[in-house]
Amino acid sequence: KLNSVMVATRELDIESTADRNWTRERLQLTHGFGAAIAPVNSVDADGLPNLLTSNIPPQSSEDELNITIDGSRIYFGELTNHYVMVKTNENEFDYPLDEGKNAQTRYEDDKGIKLDSFFKKAALAWELGDVNVLISDQLGSDSRLLLYRNIFERVNKIAPFLTLDPDPYAVTIDGSIYWIHDAYTYTNSFPYSSEYGQKVNYLRNSVKVVTDAQTGDIDLYLFDESDFIASTWSKIFPTIFKSANEMPSSLKAHVRYPEMLFQMQSEMYLRYHVTDADVFFVGEDFWSIPTEKFKQKEQLVEPYYVVMTLPGESEEEFALILPFNPQNRPNTIAWLAGRSDGDNYGKLRAYRFPTERQINGPTQIEALIDQDPAISQQITLWDSAGSEVIRGNLLMIPIGNSVIYVEPIYLQASSRKLPQLVRVVVANGNVIAMEEDFATALY
C-alpha cells in the first residue's frame, strides 16, 4: 500500500546557538540529527501531525521505518553552510540528555580533507582565512576538514553545467537519510520551439542527484539518455554519471515527477493542447490555471502530489496533478497528471471532462464555502476569539468522470505559531460539508 509522508530533517542552526566560539562552531557543533516523519492524511487528537518518527535520538512508532541513531546524522544539508573539522581532540555534540547533559559522538567515516601535514593546514588556513586551522592544538594528523557541506554548493562543484531544482527532498533508506535533487539541462536556442519566460525553450529533467546526508557522497543518475545535452556531458565526464538502472530500487521508489518542470509544462499546455491550427491561431479553446484561497488570500492553484488511481488504471500510484479552467471561465474543464511510479515515471496524462458536463472549478468551490452559513459562522467565531484561521490548499481529487474537493481548515493561536487542523471541508458538486475529519465530511 502506498502512503505519502512528510519528512522534515533536523539540521543544525548554527546562528541560534549560544556561547559561540571557534571550538564550539568548528569542532563540536558539526551536525544535525534525524527527521520528523508524519503521514499527510492523518493527525493526532489535537490536530497536530501524527508523527511516525520523532524525538532526538530518533524513535519510530513504525518498526519498518528503522530510523537509527548511527545512520541519521546530518553533516550535509540544505541549511548547512559552515565548514567543520572532525576526528579532532574534541568530541562532537550529538544530542541533549536529561539534567543538562549532552550525548557526544565522533565522526567514523573517512571523508573530508585529511589535515595530516603542515603545508595542507597552511594552505587551507590561507584559503579559509582561518589561522586556527594552522595553529590549533586540537587538530591531529587524523583530523579531517568537511568543506562545501551545503548540498547545492556541493553538487555545483561537481556538475556546474546542471541547473538544480530549488526544492530537494529528503528520504530515509535503511535508517539513513539521503537528499534527492532534480537536475536540469536547458537552452534557449532549440530550433522551432516556443520560449518559456523568454529564457528557456528546451528543458529536460535528465539527472537525479543523490547525496548521503552523513558522508556527503554524491551520485548522479542519468535518467534521460535521449537528452542530447546531458548525453554530451556524460561523454565528456564519463566517471561522474551512472545509468538510471544503477540506482538502488529502494531509492528509485522515491523518485518523483519534479514540480518545477510540471509547472512549466502545465503553463505551456494551456495553449498547446490545441491541435487545430485555425483554432490555435484565433486563440480559441485556450485554458487557464484556476485560483484558490490560501491563508485567506487568493492565489493560483499550485500542482500537488496525491496517491490515487488514475482513470483507466487498476492500481494506486503517486502522481502530481493540476486542474485547468477554460480561459475567463470558472469551471474545470481538464486536468493534467505527471506520473512517478515504475515504468510510468516521467509520463504525462491529460484528462478532459465531457463538454456537456459542467464541473465546478476551484474558484466556484471557494465561493460556495464562503457562502455556506454554518461554515462562515464558525470561521467568524474562531476569528473573533483572537485566533487566526488558515484555509489550506484546496485539493481537487478526480474520481472517474467527476471530482471532489477537499480543503483543510487550520487554527493558529496568536501567541503560538503552531497550526492545528480543526476541520475538513469536502465539496461534491454544489454540496458542501465541514466536519472534524475527512471521512465524516465525505459520508
Identify the meaning behind each predicted range.
Residues 1-443:
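Soluble extracytoplasmic regions of secretory-pathway and membrane proteins
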